[in-house]
UniProtKB/Swiss-Prot annotation:
Entry's Gene Ontology molecular function annotations: carbohydrate binding; identical protein binding; signaling receptor activity
Protein's cellular compartments: Membrane
Ranges in the topological domain labelled Extracellular: 64-223
Organism of provenance: Mus musculus (Mouse)
Entries under SMART domains matching the protein: CLECT
Gene Ontology biological process: negative regulation of natural killer cell mediated cytotoxicity
Encoding gene per record: Klrb1b
Residue window of motif LCK-binding motif: 32-35
Name of the protein this chain belongs to: Killer cell lectin-like receptor subfamily B member 1B allele A
Role this protein plays: Receptor for CLEC2D/OCIL. Ligand-binding contributes to inhibition of cytotoxic natural killer (NK) cells. May mediate MHC class I-independent 'missing-self' recognition of allografts, tumor cells and virus-infected cells.
Domain of life where this protein originates: Eukaryota
Recorded consequence of changing residue 183 to V: In strain: BALB/c
Tissue expression remark: Expressed in NK cells and a subset of T-cells.
Length: 223
């Protein structure tokens, strides 16, 4: 064997004996996938986050709605009070020649007649005979009457079959507020004179006191 053949054989041997480089093993498709419970946790987390956002939005809308409703109610109340106050300040006045006290108008009439005629005269003026509410109201009227010695009919009379004093509006007389002097019998009516409330015959001629409630109507000149 010559030298040329020997070199060729050596090259082939070297090529045959050259180590092979193995390619990296391929990974299975399941190797890169996350565990199943990770995916479930991610889904539930996203759902919970969305639900939380919706709850927050709903609460915000509810709070804004309640606040708006409260503001509207307050504004309506203020407007109503303002209107009522304006009406009271403008229209709540007694007619000319009538006295104003609390929520009533009073007038003392100087003509004399029976209790029935006095009540009828008050009715023609849109009023009634005096209904005394308490001692303070009685003191106000007594201070306003100049003729202390005269008697004035009030809206109180003795009724049958109740056998009791009653005001003309149907309420029962309260003896803790007023004390009535004099004889009481059928046909008795009450009058005030000085600081006393006296029982008299309803046919007696006395002066009288009328009263009417304050209202929202334009004051008139009742005579």
């Amino acid at each position: 064997m010559d030298s040329t053949t020997l070199v060729y054989a050596d090259l082939n041997l070297a090529r045959i004996q050259e180590p092979k480089h193995d390619s990296p093993p391929s990974l299975s498709p399941d190797t890169c996938r996350c565990p199943r419970w990770h995916r479930l946790a991610l889904k539930f987390g996203c759902a919970g986050l969305i639900l939380l956002v919706l709850v927050v939005i709903g609460l915000c809308v509810l709070v804004l709605s309640v606040q708006k409703s409260s503001v509207q109610k307050i504004c309506a109340d203020v407007q109503e009070n303002r209107t009522h106050t304006t009406d009271c300040s403008v229209n709540l006045e007694c007619p000319q020649d009538w006295l104003s006290h609390r929520d009533k108008c009073f007038r003392v009439f100087q003509v004399s007649n029976t209790w029935e005629e006095g009540q009828a005269d008050c009715g023609r003026k849109g009023a009634t005979l005096l209904l005394i509410q308490d001692q303070e109201e009685l003191r106000f009227l007594l201070d306003s009457i100049k003729e202390k010695y005269n008697s004035f009919w009030i809206g109180l009379r003795f009724t049958l079959p109740d056998m009791n004093w009653k005001w003309i509006n149907g309420t029962t007389f309260n003896s803790d507020v007023l004390k009535i002097t004099g004889d009481t019998e059928n046909g008795s009516c009450a009058s005030i004179s000085g600081d006393k409330v006296t029982s008299e015959s309803c046919s007696t001629d006395n002066r009288w006191i009328c009263q009417k409630e304050l209202n929202h109507e334009t004051p008139s000149n009742d005579s």
